[in-house]
Amino acid sequence: MFQTGEIVLYRLILARVSEIQKENGSVRYLLTSLESDDCSYEVPVENRLGHLQALPSEAKIRTLFQDLASDPGVRIARNAVDRCCKAVLEPYALKQWLSLLKTLYIDKTAAEMAGRTFVESEKRYYGIITERLITILSAALDQSPKQSEAMLNAALEAGTQEG
Protein backbone atom coordinates (compact mmCIF):
# COMPACT_ATOMS: atom_id res chain seq x y z
CA MET A 1 0.00 0.00 0.00
CA PHE A 2 1.27 3.44 -0.89
CA GLN A 3 1.63 6.16 1.75
CA THR A 4 0.44 9.76 1.80
CA GLY A 5 3.08 11.99 0.19
CA GLU A 6 4.60 9.17 -1.86
CA ILE A 7 5.33 9.85 -5.54
CA VAL A 8 3.85 7.18 -7.80
CA LEU A 9 3.13 6.57 -11.46
CA TYR A 10 -0.51 6.62 -12.52
CA ARG A 11 -0.69 5.49 -16.13
CA LEU A 12 3.00 6.45 -16.24
CA ILE A 13 2.19 10.02 -15.18
CA LEU A 14 3.93 11.33 -12.06
CA ALA A 15 1.52 11.86 -9.19
CA ARG A 16 1.67 12.29 -5.43
CA VAL A 17 -0.59 10.38 -3.06
CA SER A 18 -2.33 13.35 -1.44
CA GLU A 19 -4.76 11.36 0.67
CA ILE A 20 -5.97 7.85 1.40
CA GLN A 21 -9.75 7.99 1.75
CA LYS A 22 -11.82 5.39 3.55
CA GLU A 23 -15.52 5.58 2.82
CA ASN A 24 -18.32 3.01 3.04
CA GLY A 25 -15.89 0.13 3.36
CA SER A 26 -13.86 1.09 0.30
CA VAL A 27 -10.41 2.62 0.30
CA ARG A 28 -9.12 4.85 -2.46
CA TYR A 29 -6.04 6.88 -3.21
CA LEU A 30 -6.47 10.54 -4.04
CA LEU A 31 -3.63 11.48 -6.37
CA THR A 32 -2.45 14.90 -7.46
CA SER A 33 -0.64 15.11 -10.77
CA LEU A 34 2.88 16.51 -10.60
CA GLU A 35 2.82 17.19 -14.32
CA SER A 36 -0.25 19.36 -14.78
CA ASP A 37 -2.02 21.89 -12.59
CA ASP A 38 -5.45 21.11 -11.19
CA CYS A 39 -5.34 17.48 -12.28
CA SER A 40 -6.18 14.79 -9.77
CA TYR A 41 -7.23 11.16 -9.80
CA GLU A 42 -9.15 8.79 -7.54
CA VAL A 43 -7.94 5.20 -7.67
CA PRO A 44 -9.53 2.39 -5.64
CA VAL A 45 -6.84 0.57 -3.65
CA GLU A 46 -8.05 -2.81 -4.95
CA ASN A 47 -7.65 -1.48 -8.51
CA ARG A 48 -4.20 -0.03 -7.99
CA LEU A 49 -2.25 -2.74 -9.79
CA GLY A 50 -3.99 -1.93 -13.05
CA HIS A 51 -2.68 1.57 -13.57
CA LEU A 52 -0.88 2.60 -10.41
CA GLN A 53 2.72 1.65 -9.74
CA ALA A 54 5.68 2.68 -7.66
CA LEU A 55 8.32 4.93 -9.12
CA PRO A 56 11.04 2.56 -10.36
CA SER A 57 14.19 2.24 -8.26
CA GLU A 58 17.66 2.84 -9.66
CA ALA A 59 18.26 -0.94 -9.60
CA LYS A 60 15.02 -1.58 -11.53
CA ILE A 61 15.98 1.02 -14.15
CA ARG A 62 19.45 -0.50 -14.58
CA THR A 63 17.90 -3.96 -14.99
CA LEU A 64 15.44 -2.66 -17.60
CA PHE A 65 18.29 -1.02 -19.51
CA GLN A 66 20.51 -4.12 -19.30
CA ASP A 67 17.65 -6.29 -20.56
CA LEU A 68 17.32 -4.13 -23.69
CA ALA A 69 20.18 -5.99 -25.39
CA SER A 70 18.32 -9.31 -25.27
CA ASP A 71 14.89 -7.79 -25.89
CA PRO A 72 13.74 -8.65 -29.41
CA GLY A 73 11.77 -5.42 -29.70
CA VAL A 74 8.20 -5.08 -30.94
CA ARG A 75 7.05 -6.15 -34.36
CA ILE A 76 5.35 -3.15 -35.97
CA ALA A 77 3.11 -3.78 -38.97
CA ARG A 78 4.02 -0.93 -41.32
CA ASN A 79 0.42 -0.54 -42.45
CA ALA A 80 -0.88 -0.39 -38.85
CA VAL A 81 1.67 1.62 -36.85
CA ASP A 82 -0.95 3.33 -34.67
CA ARG A 83 -2.71 0.08 -33.78
CA CYS A 84 0.56 -1.74 -33.01
CA CYS A 85 1.98 1.08 -30.90
CA LYS A 86 -1.25 1.75 -28.98
CA ALA A 87 -1.53 -1.95 -28.10
CA VAL A 88 1.91 -1.77 -26.46
CA LEU A 89 1.37 1.58 -24.74
CA GLU A 90 -2.05 0.95 -23.19
CA PRO A 91 -0.93 -1.45 -20.42
CA TYR A 92 1.45 1.25 -19.09
CA ALA A 93 4.30 -1.21 -18.56
CA LEU A 94 7.80 0.31 -18.61
CA LYS A 95 9.42 -2.85 -20.01
CA GLN A 96 7.05 -2.91 -23.01
CA TRP A 97 7.47 0.83 -23.56
CA LEU A 98 11.26 0.37 -23.66
CA SER A 99 10.88 -2.56 -26.03
CA LEU A 100 8.79 -0.45 -28.40
CA LEU A 101 11.23 2.46 -28.06
CA LYS A 102 14.08 0.12 -28.99
CA THR A 103 12.26 -0.88 -32.19
CA LEU A 104 11.51 2.75 -33.04
CA TYR A 105 15.13 3.73 -32.29
CA ILE A 106 16.37 1.02 -34.68
CA ASP A 107 13.94 2.25 -37.38
CA LYS A 108 14.98 5.87 -36.79
CA THR A 109 18.69 5.03 -36.98
CA ALA A 110 18.18 2.94 -40.14
CA ALA A 111 16.25 5.77 -41.80
CA GLU A 112 18.95 8.29 -40.92
CA MET A 113 21.72 6.02 -42.22
CA ALA A 114 19.83 5.46 -45.49
CA GLY A 115 19.18 9.18 -45.92
CA ARG A 116 15.42 8.70 -45.53
CA THR A 117 13.07 10.56 -43.25
CA PHE A 118 11.75 8.77 -40.20
CA VAL A 119 8.12 7.72 -40.77
CA GLU A 120 5.88 10.42 -39.26
CA SER A 121 3.65 8.06 -37.26
CA GLU A 122 6.66 6.29 -35.77
CA LYS A 123 8.33 9.65 -35.09
CA ARG A 124 5.26 10.73 -33.09
CA TYR A 125 5.36 7.61 -30.88
CA TYR A 126 9.13 7.90 -30.50
CA GLY A 127 8.65 11.44 -29.18
CA ILE A 128 5.82 10.49 -26.81
CA ILE A 129 7.68 7.53 -25.31
CA THR A 130 11.01 9.37 -25.06
CA GLU A 131 9.44 12.36 -23.32
CA ARG A 132 7.53 10.16 -20.86
CA LEU A 133 10.57 8.03 -20.01
CA ILE A 134 12.82 11.07 -19.54
CA THR A 135 10.27 12.52 -17.11
CA ILE A 136 10.08 9.24 -15.17
CA LEU A 137 13.87 8.81 -15.08
CA SER A 138 14.35 12.39 -13.88
CA ALA A 139 11.94 11.88 -10.99
CA ALA A 140 13.09 8.37 -10.08
CA LEU A 141 16.80 9.18 -10.13
CA ASP A 142 16.51 12.81 -8.99
CA GLN A 143 18.43 14.12 -11.99
CA SER A 144 17.92 16.67 -14.72
CA PRO A 145 16.00 15.89 -17.91
CA LYS A 146 19.25 16.34 -19.89
CA GLN A 147 20.98 13.71 -17.74
CA SER A 148 17.98 11.39 -18.13
CA GLU A 149 17.92 11.88 -21.89
CA ALA A 150 21.64 11.08 -22.13
CA MET A 151 21.15 8.00 -19.96
CA LEU A 152 18.21 6.80 -22.10
CA ASN A 153 20.12 7.40 -25.35
CA ALA A 154 23.15 5.52 -24.00
CA ALA A 155 20.92 2.60 -22.99
CA LEU A 156 19.29 2.51 -26.43
CA GLU A 157 22.68 2.66 -28.15
CA ALA A 158 24.05 -0.14 -25.97
CA GLY A 159 20.85 -2.16 -26.31
CA THR A 160 20.97 -2.09 -30.10
CA GLN A 161 24.64 -2.97 -30.60
CA GLU A 162 25.19 -6.28 -32.32
CA GLY A 163 27.15 -8.53 -30.08
Where are these regions (language model features)?
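A positional/architectural concept
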Residues: M1-Q53
